[in-house]
Amino acid sequence: MEAGYYRIPMTTTDSTKFHDLLSGFVRIHILHHAAEGEVYGQWLIEELARHGYRISPGTLYPMLQAMEERGYLNSREDRDGRLGRRRKLYRTTAAGRRGLKAARERLRELTGEVGQKAGRRGQ
């Protein structure tokens, strides 16, 4: 693993404890961006970092492969115009868009409930 990378931690030092919880949010981010247009691994790493996730290529690429195998993403190979390197571009499938829609509905419900309880209990 490259120096400075962890397995999907947030920005805190305790975050590796929450890997199993946060990986679902990372997948939702991936589906969201891949629904808007084609995305590739390095761009996703940088975009996720803007949201506080530090994810290594060794974690992201197997996640993308699994999402493709489960039918949430399609990929195609392309050449990076600047460097001429091959890269994989990902886009959501119909199943991925349905999954994203379901995730958004659940997130709205969850954030409403968590926000209510936090306000009510002073947490």
Which positions does each model-derived feature cover?
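Short beta-strand/turn micro-motifs at beta-sheet edges
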Residues: T16-D20, E77-R79
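Amphipathic alpha-helical dimerization/coiled-coil segments
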Residues: R7-I8, R97-Q123
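Accessory beta->alpha helical hairpin/"wing" motif in late/C-terminal subdomains of nucleic-acid enzymes
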Residues: T92-G96
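Basic amphipathic alpha-helical segments that dock to polyanions
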Residues: L60-P62, A66-R70
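Short, intrinsically disordered or compositionally biased N-terminal tails of bacterial proteins
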Residues: M1-K17
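N-terminal helix-turn-helix DNA-binding core of bacterial DNA-binding proteins
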Residues: F18-Y61
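Beta-hairpin "wing" of winged helix-turn-helix
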Residues: R70-R86, R91
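A cross-family signal for key residues in well-ordered alpha-helices
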Residues: H29-H32, Q65, K101, R108
